[in-house]
């Protein structure tokens, strides 16, 4: 709650709770949703896939139904580059084939498809953003991610550099770049 702006109203509830979702959407007269509600640990998704199917996919289904029933026609979806799996081409283009290699990526791709069908059935506007590694924060430190345990690449690298973690494994050394590692585009949190 300390991360919520003082002028914002904080609601604690589940994306999978239809009644809760419709109450908030109606009370706040929401006209668009930014959908970040998903479990996102690749390793955990492989050992506990049902948790990911239930929250990520079923929860999104409930959200979309609530949006339809409340007349909310705009959604920005936080997806993942994990939907591509092992890319056939570098750099990866949005038009490249998707082939997730883990449950997390599979659920995110399914969520994208659900949102696309929501668009086709109800004329809703949407965009799915396929991030690679989320890193950084607003200069104030107010906007950004905090994980415990840390699971994201850049913070793990910083933990190694500061001696709080012994090592990091780097996978992929045969890309057509100066050091053999892949190159990624990025968007700044302030953009």
Predicted segments with their positions:
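NAD(P)-dependent short-chain dehydrogenase/reductase
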Residues: 116-191
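N-terminal Rossmann-like NAD(P)+-binding domain of SDR-like oxidoreductases, especially those catalyzing
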Residues: 1-134
């Amino acid at each position: 709650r300390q991360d919520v702006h003082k002028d914002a109203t904080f609601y604690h509830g589940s994306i999978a709770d239809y009644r809760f979702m419709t109450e908030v959407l109606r009370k706040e007269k929401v006209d668009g949703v930014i959908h970040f509600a998903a479990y996102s640990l690749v390793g955990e998704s492989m050992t506990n896939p049902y948790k990911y199917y239930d929250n990520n996919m079923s929860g999104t289904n409930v959200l979309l139904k609530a949006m339809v029933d409340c007349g909310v026609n705009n959604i920005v979806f936080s997806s993942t580059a994990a939907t591509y799996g092992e890319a056939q081409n570098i750099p990866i283009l949005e038009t490249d084939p998707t082939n997730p290699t883990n449950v997390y990526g599979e659920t995110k791709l399914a969520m994208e498809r659900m949102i696309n069908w929501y668009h086709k059935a109800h004329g809703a506007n949407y965009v799915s953003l396929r991030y690679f590694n989320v890193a950084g924060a607003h200069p104030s430190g107010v906007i950004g991610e905090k994980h415990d345990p840390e699971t994201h690449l850049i913070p793990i690298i910083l933990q190694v550099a500061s001696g709080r973690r012994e090592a990091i494994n780097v996978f992929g050394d045969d890309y057509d770049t100066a050091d053999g590692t892949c190159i990624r585009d990025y968007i700044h949190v302030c953009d």
